[in-house]
């Protein structure tokens, strides 16, 4: 792909997201979603192959269906209220349709089937955009309409997403699919707190983007796409492997790493709102995620697949400039929780 065309596509993706996040008009919001979708499809097919074509087609069909449902909900709401304002949601049917459309765009269960398949079919940089930047626009719209969303349905979807995100990743060896199921589970945590404290949901999104970006950048740097290739990075880049392990454990929510912070705050907030059964179930189901991250850490750090002798000592020739660039992002992704008391004392 021509670099100039690629820059234009990335600019359009960012512009579409900014239109959605800053607009208070339903038509402009829908227009931003369409700009975003039409620009991301060529990016997913950047490395042309039958697998990437299939992934881009699945993504396009899912997002186009969600956009049609969203437009139907907008028209129904306009018919009953006579206004294009986002915050003015008076019709129950329109509210339900908008919830379904946005959860389809986010990849929440039971509309999650496209997320692992599309992520596995695209390259690592495209997967990074898909699992981080593409979550911002739907979540910002949910943030604006959370007061009119059906709370019980959203909580049921969130619990189902946490469960499927944990179970789906248990038997996976492909790192992109593991990251996709992790994304489904994290989206479930964000939706669970959205109806009680939407600001906390945005904080969770920010931490999730930091952790997922760190993990994908480490995978891109080490060219790892499976458990086998990740285990061989000990010979190529020991520092990268150590960073990957701590980032994986942070994604699993193991204290005292950064990933434990949003789970801790969400469970605390749900308990304050007299909800006991839901946070208990969420904490139990989160152990599924932690289990496959621990298994991945074990297979990477404590075991080593058979390898050729010519792969040894390659770490001496690695470029350390990229490591220094990634260091701040990885520090935030792993050590934000232990550093929090120090930041409070400094202030």
Swiss-Prot record:
Subcellular location: Mitochondrion inner membrane
UniProt keyword Methyltransferase present: no
Molecular function GO labels: NADH dehydrogenase (ubiquinone) activity
Keyword list, A-Z: Electron transport, Membrane, Mitochondrion, Mitochondrion inner membrane, NAD, Respiratory chain, Translocase, Transmembrane, Transmembrane helix, Transport, Ubiquinone
A single GO cellular-component term on record: mitochondrial inner membrane
Transmembrane annotation, as ranges: 1-21, 25-45, 59-79, 96-116, 122-142, 149-169, 178-198, 201-221, 237-257, 274-294, 326-346
Keyword rRNA processing carried by entry: no
One example of a Gene Ontology biological process annotation: mitochondrial electron transport, NADH to ubiquinone
Record's catalysed reaction(s): a ubiquinone + NADH + 5 H(+)(in) = a ubiquinol + NAD(+) + 4 H(+)(out)
UniProt membrane topology term: Multi-pass membrane protein
Self-association state and partner proteins as the record states: Core subunit of respiratory chain NADH dehydrogenase (Complex I) which is composed of 45 different subunits. Interacts with TMEM242.
Role description: Core subunit of the mitochondrial membrane respiratory chain NADH dehydrogenase (Complex I) that is believed to belong to the minimal assembly required for catalysis. Complex I functions in the transfer of electrons from NADH to the respiratory chain. The immediate electron acceptor for the enzyme is believed to be ubiquinone.
Family: Belongs to the complex I subunit 2 family.
The protein's name in its UniProt record: NADH-ubiquinone oxidoreductase chain 2
Protein species of origin: Crocidura suaveolens gueldenstaedtii
């Amino acid at each position: 792909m021509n670099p100039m065309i690629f820059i234009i596509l990335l600019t359009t993706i960012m512009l579409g997201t900014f239109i959605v996040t800053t607009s208070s008009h339903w038509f402009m919001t829908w227009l931003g979603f369409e700009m975003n979708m039409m620009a991301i499809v060529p990016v997913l097919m950047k490395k042309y192959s039958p697998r990437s074509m299939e992934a881009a087609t699945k993504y396009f069909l899912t997002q186009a269906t969600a956009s049609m449902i969203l437009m139907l909900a907008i028209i129904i709401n306009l018919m009953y209220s006579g206004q294009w304002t986002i915050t003015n949601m008076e019709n129950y049917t329109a509210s339900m349709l908008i919830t379904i459309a946005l959860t389809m765009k986010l990849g929440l269960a039971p509309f999650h089937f496209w997320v692992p398949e599309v992520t596995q079919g695209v390259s690592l940089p495209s997967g990074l955009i898909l699992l981080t930047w593409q979550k911002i626009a739907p979540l910002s719209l949910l943030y604006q309409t959370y007061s009119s969303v059906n709370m019980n349905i959203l909580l049921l979807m969130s619990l189902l997403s946490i469960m499927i995100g944990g179970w789906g990743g248990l038997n996976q060896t492909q790192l992109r699919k593991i990251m996709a199921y992790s994304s489904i589970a994290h989206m479930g945590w964000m939706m669970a707190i959205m109806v009680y404290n939407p600001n906390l949901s945005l904080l969770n999104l920010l931490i999730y983007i930091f952790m997922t970006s760190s993990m994908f950048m480490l995978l891109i740097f080490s060219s790892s796409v499976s458990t086998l290739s990740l285990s061989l990075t000990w010979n190529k880049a020991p520092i990268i492997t150590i960073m990957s392990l701590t980032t994986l454990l942070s994604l699993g929510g193991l204290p005292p790493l950064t990933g434990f912070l949003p789970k801790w705050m969400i469970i605390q907030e749900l308990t304050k709102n007299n909800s006991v059964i839901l946070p208990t179930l969420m904490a139990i189901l989160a152990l599924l995620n932690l289990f496959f991250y621990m298994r991945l850490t074990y297979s990477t750090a404590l075991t080593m697949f058979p390898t050729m002798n010519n792969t040894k000592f390659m770490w001496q020739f690695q470029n350390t400039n990229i490591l220094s660039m990634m260091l701040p992002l990885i520090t935030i992704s792993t050590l934000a929780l232990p550093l929090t008391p120090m930041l409070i004392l400094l202030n």
